Curated annotation (Swiss-Prot):
<keyword id="KW-0028">Amino-acid biosynthesis</keyword>
<comment type="function">
    <text>Catalyzes the oxidation of 3-carboxy-2-hydroxy-4-methylpentanoate (3-isopropylmalate) to 3-carboxy-4-methyl-2-oxopentanoate. The product decarboxylates to 4-methyl-2 oxopentanoate.</text>
</comment>
<feature type="binding site">
    <location>
        <position position="136"/>
    </location>
    <ligand>
        <name>substrate</name>
    </ligand>
</feature>
<dbReference type="InterPro" id="IPR019818">
    <property type="entry name" value="IsoCit/isopropylmalate_DH_CS"/>
</dbReference>
<dbReference type="Pfam" id="PF00180">
    <property type="entry name" value="Iso_dh"/>
</dbReference>
<protein>
    <recommendedName>
        <fullName>3-isopropylmalate dehydrogenase</fullName>
        <ecNumber>1.1.1.85</ecNumber>
    </recommendedName>
</protein>
<dbReference type="GO" id="GO:0000287">
    <property type="term" value="F:magnesium ion binding"/>
</dbReference>
<keyword id="KW-0464">Manganese</keyword>
<dbReference type="GO" id="GO:0009098">
    <property type="term" value="P:L-leucine biosynthetic process"/>
</dbReference>
<comment type="similarity">
    <text>Belongs to the isocitrate and isopropylmalate dehydrogenases family. LeuB type 1 subfamily.</text>
</comment>
<keyword id="KW-0479">Metal-binding</keyword>
<feature type="binding site">
    <location>
        <position position="108"/>
    </location>
    <ligand>
        <name>substrate</name>
    </ligand>
</feature>
<comment type="pathway">
    <text>Amino-acid biosynthesis; L-leucine biosynthesis; L-leucine from 3-methyl-2-oxobutanoate: step 3/4.</text>
</comment>
<feature type="binding site">
    <location>
        <begin position="284"/>
        <end position="296"/>
    </location>
    <ligand>
        <name>NAD(+)</name>
    </ligand>
</feature>
<keyword id="KW-0560">Oxidoreductase</keyword>
<dbReference type="InterPro" id="IPR024084">
    <property type="entry name" value="IsoPropMal-DH-like_dom"/>
</dbReference>
<dbReference type="GO" id="GO:0005829">
    <property type="term" value="C:cytosol"/>
</dbReference>
Length: 362
C-alpha cells in the first residue's frame, strides 16, 4: 500500500499519556503489516500545555496539527486547573483545535461487541447486534447561532436568548459526510430533526432530501428528535447511520453511547473538508486513576482504527485493529471498568501487550 503519514500526537492530561502509548503502538503495528509508515510528533495540549506555556492550546501545537495528516488526542482536563478563568481551562483547547482545523463533522460509533452485551443497562435481546454511527454537526445550530446572551427587558427582568441557525451550505456539507459514511456501512441514513415545529429543521430536511438522488445506494429516512430518543432505547437495532444538528447530536450521541455499557470503549472522529481529522476517545482524562495502570486503552485504540479508515484510507488496517480488540475480549481480558465474572482483569499496559499479541497472531 505504501505511503508515509505525519501524525500529531497529543497525549494531554490524566490517563491520556498511558492510553496514547497503547494507541500509537497499535498504529505502528498496523503500519508494519500493511506496508506504510508513520512519523509521530508529540506536542502538549490542555493542562499539560498550561503548565508548560500558560495556554491550553499553544500556537506551536496548532501549527503542528495543521501540518499533519491526522491528530491523535488522548484526553484533557483535571481538578488542578478548575479554578482558572473559563477561557484558560484545558477544555478550551478542544474548541480551539476544532476551529483551527475547520472541523465540522463529529462521528461517534456506538457498537455493542458480542463479548460486552451484558455490560449494557438494557436487556441483551434489545442491544445484541447494535451498531450505530451518529454524525453530528459541530459548528452551527443552537450553540453558535446569533443573537445569543442574557439581555435586560424594558419592563424589568432579564431574558436569555439562543438562536438555532443553519445555512443550506452547512447542512449540505454535513449531509454529504453522513451519506458517504452510510454508504461505507449498511446503506441506511436516518436524518433526525424537529421539522414539525422548527423552520431550521424544515430547511435541514429539504437539503437532505435534495442530496438523496446523488446517493441512490443509501436509503434516507427522517425521524423527529423526540421519537429518535425513544427509539434508541426501544429498538436500537433499527438504526445504522444517524445525522443531526449540533445540540440534537450532542444529546443523542451520549444516549447511544450508553447502550454499550462503558464509555471506555467509545472512539470518535472529528472531520473537516480535506484537512487533518481529530481522533480521540469519548471518555475524559480520569484523573482519579491516572498513573495507576488502570485505564482502559480500547477507546483510544479504536480511535486509531477510525484514523486509519477516515484520514489515511487504510480500511484493511482499520479492520485488523478492530479485530484485535474483539480477540482480546473473546480471550476474556478486561480492564476494571468492563470487568465481568470470570474475566481476567489486566491493567492498561498488559491490555496493550495482549492487543499487540492478538494483532501479530492474526
Amino acid at each position: 500500500m505504501g505511503g508515509r503519514y505525519k501524525i500529531a500526537v497529543l497525549p494531554g492530561d490524566g490517563i491520556g499519556t498511558e492510553i496514547v502509548q497503547v494507541g500509537v503502538a497499535m498504529l505502528e503495528a498496523a503500519a508494519r503489516r500493511f506496508d506504510f509508515a508513520f512519523d509521530f510528533e508529540e506536542a502538549p495540549i490542555g493542562g499539560a500545555a498550561i503548565d508548560a506555556t500558560g495556554e491550553p492550546l499553544p500556537a506551536a501545537t496548532l501549527e503542528l496539527c495543521k501540518a499533519s495528516d491526522a491528530v491523535f488526542l488522548g484526553a484533557v482536563g483535571g481538578p488542578q486547573w478548575d479554578t482558572l478563568p473559563s477561557d484558560k481551562r484545558p477544555e478550551k483547547a478542544l474548541l480551539g483545535l476544532r476551529a483551527g482545523l475547520g472541523l465540522f463533522a463529529n462521528l461517534r460509533p456506538a457498537r455493542i461487541l458480542p463479548q460486552l452485551v451484558a455490560a449494557s443497562a438494557l436487556k441483551p435481546e434489545v442491544v445484541e447486534g447494535v451498531d450505530i454511527l451518529v454524525v453530528r454537526e459541530l459548528t452551527g445550530g443552537l450553540y453558535f447561532g446569533i443573537p445569543k446572551g442574557i439581555f435586560p427587558e424594558k419592563k424589568g427582568g432579564r431574558r436569555g436568548v439562543n438562536t438555532m441557525s443553519y445555512s443550506a451550505f452547512e447542512i449540505e456539507r454535513i449531509g454529504r459526510v453522513a451519506f458517504e459514511a452510510a454508504r461505507e456501512r449498511r446503506g441506511k441514513l436516518c436524518s433526525v430533526d424537529k421539522a414539525n415545529v422548527l423552520e431550521v429543521s424544515q430547511l435541514w430536511r429539504e437539503v437532505l432530501v435534495g442530496l438523496a438522488p446523488e446517493y441512490p445506494d443509501v436509503e434516507l429516512t427522517h425521524m423527529y428528535v423526540d421519537n429518535c430518543a425513544m427509539q434508541l432505547v426501544r429498538r436500537p437495532r433499527q438504526f445504522d447511520t444517524i445525522v443531526t444538528e449540533n445540540m440534537f447530536g450532542d444529546i443523542l450521541s451520549d444516549e447511544a453511547a450508553m447502550l454499550t455499557g462503558s464509555i471506555g470503549m467509545l472512539p470518535s472522529a472529528s472531520l473537516g473538508s480535506g484537512g487533518p481529522g481529530l481522533y480521540e476517545p469519548v471518555h475524559g482524562s480520569a484523573p482519579d486513576i491516572a498513573g495507576q495502570d488502570k485505564a482502559n486503552p480500547l477507546a483510544q485504540v479504536l480511535s486509531g482504527a477510525m484514523l486509519l479508515r477516515h484520514s489515511l484510507r487504510q480500511p484493511e488496517a482499520a479492520q485488523a485493529v478492530e479485530r484485535a480488540v474483539q480477540t482480546v475480549l473473546e480471550q476474556g481480558y478486561r480492564t476494571g471498568d468492563i470487568a465481568a465474572p470470570g474475566a481476567q482483569i489486566v491493567g492498561c499496559r498488559a491490555m496493550g501487550e495482549q492487543l499487540l499479541a492478538a494483532f501479530e497472531r492474526a
